[in-house]
Amino acid sequence: MIRMKISARNQLRGTVETIVLGVVTAKVSVRVGDNLIESVITRQSVEDLNIKIGSEVTAVIKSTEIMLMVD
């Protein structure tokens, strides 16, 4: 497996708590400690990354967006 390196420094590890699927997008809620972070990503990304409730993900926070990545 290839390990990704990215320039974003704000990365928070968490667990997917809820996924609300729309036609094109999905709202993914990630529990990070006592906090809940929500990210709107494409439905296709949820499927491609195999994100499910209980999945461990990393929230990558940029000034304009929150991306999700999986190992």
What are these regions (language model features)?
Residues 1-71:
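Non-catalytic connector elements of ABC transporters
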